[in-house]
A protein has these predicted regions:
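Active-site cofactor/cluster-binding pocket
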Residues: 1-259
Length: 260
């Protein structure tokens, strides 16, 4: 799993919570199934490792978070080039990086956007559409900021809570809960336990708000149909093309600069 976000938006905290919750689900599976290793010790059914990446400037700068959840221990702890899931919390990510880099065939991209269907597909740049089609990547949109705005009036908390929507989105698009026969109640209990541990000192209202954002993220993630690569090109956050003043006025390239 790879996160793409911005410093100050809480993605690192979300990534840590995600790893801790999966660890708690592993404990739940042991308590339920009593699986032991060859030495009779509790067996790790889901191995988790994770690490963040961000610059010294941190706030406002692009950040990444990498996490592995696997049935066998993977003895590396580094930036991941090959991933199955990308949680793209940064709606501008396609303007400064390639969130699809290293995605596996049939992987899942969850992207911050309030749009769905054809409208969302037309927001993706042409080069990204080609990679999505070539690799048969499933694309989901999630209105994380809208969900966070509805949960709190505080602007700083809206930014930091957005990542919780993507935590819910991850479990919604991942087959993990179904594969391990984890019920919705067991899942919510594991998340609530982690949120109490992480945010409990801030009060019950903060825990409940984060639970609300996570739950709506789980429910509101939407898969978009992959359209044609030739669909209208309407990427967001890209201004109109500008031309030099001389060209706009019909002057020769050498005119208008350094004359007189």
């Amino acid at each position: 799993v790879r996160f793409h976000s911005v410093g100050g938006w809480g993605a690192i905290t979300t990534g840590k919570n995600l790893g801790a919750i999966i660890g708690d689900l592993n404990d739940l599976l042991y308590d339920r199934d009593k699986v032991v290793d060859e030495f009779g010790n509790p067996k790790e059914i889901i191995h988790v490792s994770a690490n963040p990446k961000y610059g010294s400037e941190k706030k406002g700068a692009p950040t990444s978070y990498f996490m592995i959840a696997a049935p066998e221990r993977i003895r590396v702890n580094c930036d991941l080039r090959h991933v199955n899931v990308v949680l793209c919390c940064d709606p501008k990510a396609f303007t400064h990086t390639n969130p699809l880099d290293g995605m596996s065939e049939g992987g899942c991209l969850v992207w911050e956007s309030e749009e769905e269907g054809e409208a969302a597909w037309e927001r993706l740049p042409l080069w990204a559409r080609k990679q999505i089609i070539d690799k048969n990547i499933r694309v989901f949109t999630l209105p994380g900021f809208k969900i966070a705005r509805e949960a709190t009036d505080r602007g700083d908390l809206q930014l930091r809570m957005q990542g919780n929507a993507f935590l819910g989105g991850f479990f919604s698009v991942s087959p993990m809960l179904q594969d391990f026969r984890i019920t919705p109640e067991q899942f919510r209990d594991a998340v609530h336990k982690q949120y109490v541990k992480k945010f409990g000192k801030l009060g019950e209202a903060v825990v409940n708000s984060n639970m609300e954002v996570m739950t709506k993220g789980f429910e509101l993630v939407r898969e978009i149909n992959v359209g044609a690569i030739e669909a209208p090109d309407r990427p967001t956050l890209r201004g109109k093309a500008l031309v030099p003043m001389a060209m706009a006025e019909g002057l020769a390239a050498s005119e208008g600069c350094g004359t007189g």
